[in-house]
Regions:
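Bacterial N-terminal signal peptides
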Residues: 5-15
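Compositionally biased, proline/threonine/alanine/serine-rich low-complexity intrinsically disordered stretches
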Residues: 14-24, 589-596, 663-681
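N-terminal maturation segment of proteins
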Residues: 19-593
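A short glycine-rich, His/Asp/Glu-containing loop-to-beta-strand
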Residues: 605-633, 637-642
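Short beta-strand segments in beta-sandwich/barrel cores
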Residues: 620, 630-632, 648-652, 697
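Histidine-centered metal-chelating micro-motifs
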Residues: 629-631, 682-709
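Glycine- and acidic-residue-biased ligand/ion/polar-headgroup-sensing regions
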Residues: 636-659, 664, 678-685
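Ligand-binding loop in jelly-roll beta-barrel domains
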Residues: 647, 701-719
Length: 720
């Protein structure tokens, strides 16, 4: 077999001691990520406040603001996104690290989606019972506003004083949309009116803006009692004088609209609605599948899951009636009392399931979040319409991950409770989102989800977590619990059918309810088209990739390694997830091919090289490079390569170990200029070398020759 020989020079990466003024380094894509994200946060002050992105006086300004969400403010954000896309395109992907390249692709996808989505903004009414301003403003302050110090409490009161102005912004936008006949169906408007009336039905002192504020100040224990009462009284006064009148103005706008509206539910009812729905499906599933294709996938999965459920119901002796009738009877038999004692009992069970899940997860995960997770019920005014949800922990540790559950009657059952907790907490959303926040390898915009999340992967992972718990024996001999897990999966499969039915096939609200989806869920799909499809489409992709990994690796497959691969990808579109898993499979195949007893140590090189060294040997088991970077390697035809290190490289490896130990002196006899600054090694496990290729200098006097022969390991780019 032909032998290929090429020459590169290698320098150990240590501090610069150059003579004279060093050249100014070129701006990197990582610099762009940092600067653009800061600009993005300044354009989105509510996000800056919730994540505590800045510090000092600048952060204080954001924490005192309640930013507007108007057509004008959104236009400024779109202009910033377009500017970001233009600048991002100036960076050469071939000069990026793997993480940088994926981050650039993710940012490009997110900014393009935001820009495209703004033209469909008129299809989103600003007042509705699930994600309207009337819901988001209370959630922003009562849950997400940082509240640790007395200054935080003062900022809360300052922002509360701006709530009425933000509600008036929403009313003005809603009035403009109504003039174009762009408003929700009658049943959505009526439900929103009921919810808004309920929000202002209590005395101001009992309103969530006041009670949650008082409770959080008390929990923080940093605000003196007298000052705490003073601030609470200020909040109560603002709610009475400003917030309640603003809510009444919103209700006054909606009431006549409810008289004008009909019950047509889907986007098809609007001009351009079909295009808007196609965009929604692309946004939420990150695929190009049509509504019809997704509808058919849903029908197939519904039939499969119903057959499996029927078998378990028969084992439980429930043979009479339709599947839905038998499930309802079982669900009712496991209901909690609709009393305060019942509410306490369900929350106690949630806590037990959550902590038990944390213990069991150690068998499937070797990487778990540091941030804690807590569970709490929704405030009463949200119970009728809210879906169970997870809120990420604060990056500074001031707020844990939070699971909120609505304690309305249909949720007060043990039947699906275990599955719900697994989805929202451990090993579901809390594992994925908190681990992403804690991953130092990711740029900050990804750790904080500054540009938003990716529903297909987030919700797909949550649904996968439900299934994983069932597959792993977490339900033990609990047949009712296993049935509940299948019922929740059936629910997500029906969502594919119902969401596409409503928005592409002219289904009515009642048709969707008759198909097996409760009314409040149907209404959520009406106001948030496409999102319900993200769950199962994401889960199916994860399961497909897991099956691929099992077939590729055989008895070398490790569920922990697979989960590491998926979770380390961060929140990305499904095609990028697949590329990450493919890279893991190539690497795992390399490891599996090693002789017994030999292991590998990963080494991450700057700017864009990654290698796997066999521990205790001089083999480079894997070298990864960006496409087209001929300065690092020559094109070759052999699919498998073996690289033999020269003696000089072995000395460099020793030097790398010394540098990582904090010494950094070159080995005896080494000559030449000091290497360039700026490189760094992200080195898990044992100390290993940090080296980089350069075309201008060598740490050693002699050049280093790599002799490549046909033998062992391929050279490839891990994400392409």
């Amino acid at each position: 077999m032909k032998t290929l020989v090429f020459v590169v020079t290698v320098a150990a990466v240590v501090g610069l001691s150059a003579q004279g003024e060093p050249p100014r380094p070129a701006r990197t894509v990582s610099d762009f990520f940092r600067d653009f994200t800061a600009d993005w946060m300044r354009a989105n002050p509510n996000q800056a406040a919730s994540t505590r992105y800045f510090s000092g006086a600048e952060q204080d300004r954001f924490e005192e603001q309640l930013a507007p969400n108007t057509p004008a403010s959104r236009h400024e954000v779109v202009l910033l996104a377009q500017k970001g896309l233009t600048e991002l395109a100036t960076f050469d992907p071939a000069r990026m690290s793997v993480t940088e390249r994926v981050s650039a692709e993710l940012m490009q996808w997110q900014l393009n989606t935001l820009v495209e989505g703004e033209k469909y903004r008129d299809y989103q009414f600003p007042l509705e019972q699930f994600g309207g301003v009337n819901v988001n403003l209370p959630a922003l302050l009562t849950v997400n506003h940082p509240l640790v110090t007395e200054k935080d409490a003062e900022h809360y009161v300052a922002r509360l004083g701006q709530v009425s102005a933000r509600m008036d912004d929403a009313i003005a936008e809603a009035r403009g949309l109504a003039a174009k006949n762009m408003f929700p169906p009658r049943f959505i408007l009526r439900a929103t009116i009921v919810q808004m009336r309920q929000f202002i039905a209590t005395p101001p002192a009992k309103n969530p803006f006041v009670t949650a504020f008082a409770d959080r100040m008390a929990a923080a224990k940093t605000v003196p009692d007298a000052r705490r009462e003073e601030l609470r009284a200020q909040a109560e006064k603002i709610v009475a004088a400003q917030v309640y009148p603003a809510w009444k103005r919103g209700i006054a706008l909606l009431e006549p609209l409810a008289g004008r509206a009909n019950d047509d539910a889907g986007l098809w009812r609007f001009k351009g609605g079909d295009d808007a729905y196609r965009f929604a499906l692309r946004r939420f599933t990150t695929t190009n599948l049509s509504a019809e294709e997704i509808h058919q996938i849903g029908l197939k999965r519904v039939a499969e899951i119903e057959q499996e459920m029927d078998g378990i119901l028969k084992k439980l002796g429930r043979t009479q009636g339709t599947l839905q009738e038998r499930v309802k009877a079982l669900e009712k038999s496991q209901a909690y009392p609709l009393t305060e004692d019942g509410r306490k009992a369900i929350m106690a069970d949630v806590e037990q399931i959550l902590r038990d899940g944390e213990r069991r997860a150690a068998l499937q995960f070797d990487t778990r979040p540091k941030a804690p997770i807590v569970a709490q019920p929704y405030p009463r005014f949200r119970e009728a319409n809210a879906a169970a949800s997870y809120s990420a922990p604060a990056p500074d540790g001031s707020r844990p991950g939070t699971f909120q559950i609505p304690l309305r009657p249909e949720r007060m059952t043990k039947y699906t409770l275990r599955t719900l907790v697994y989805h929202e907490t451990v090993p579901g959303h809390h594992f994925q989102i908190a681990l992403e926040m804690e991953n130092p390898a990711l740029p900050r915009f990804r750790r904080l989800r500054a540009l938003g999340g990716i529903s297909a992967l987030s919700e797909g992972w949550g649904l996968y977590a439900e299934r994983l718990a069932a597959e792993s024996g977490w339900y033990e001999n609990d047949l009712e619990g296993q049935l509940g897990q299948l019922d929740m999966e059936l629910f997500r499969a029906r969502r594919l059918v119902v969401d596409t039915g409503l928005h592409a096939k002219h289904w009515t609200r009642q048709q969707a309810i008759d198909y097996g989806i409760e009314a409040s869920e149907v209404e959520r799909y009406v106001v948030n088209p496409g999102q319900a499809c993200s769950y199962m489409m994401g889960e199916l992709k994860i399961l497909e990739l897991r099956e691929k990994a099992k077939k590729t690796l055989g008895d070398k497959f490790s569920i922990k390694d697979f989960h590491n691969a998926v979770l380390s990808a961060g929140t990305v579109p499904l095609d990028l997830l697949e590329r990450r898993v493919d890279a893991y499979l190539r690497e795992a195949t390399v490891v599996a091919s090693l002789p017994k007893g030999e292991s590998v140590v990963p080494v991450y090189h700057e700017p864009h090289h990654r290698m796997l060294f066999a521990a205790g040997t001089t083999k480079i088991l894997e070298a990864q490079v960006p496409p087209g970077d001929t300065s690092w390697y020559h094109t070759h035809t052999e699919p498998v390569l073996y690289i033999t290190l020269s003696q000089s490289q072995q000395r460099t490896q020793v030097l790398g170990q010394e540098m990582n130990a904090g010494r950094g002196a070159p080995p005896a006899g080494a000559r030449g200029n000091a290497p360039p600054a700026g490189g760094r090694a992200n080195v898990p496990g044992p100390a290993v070398p940090a080296i980089r290729a350069t075309s201008t200098t060598s740490y050693y006097e002699e050049p280093i020759t790599h002799r490549i022969t046909n033998a062992a390991i391929a050279c490839f780019d891990s994400w392409s």
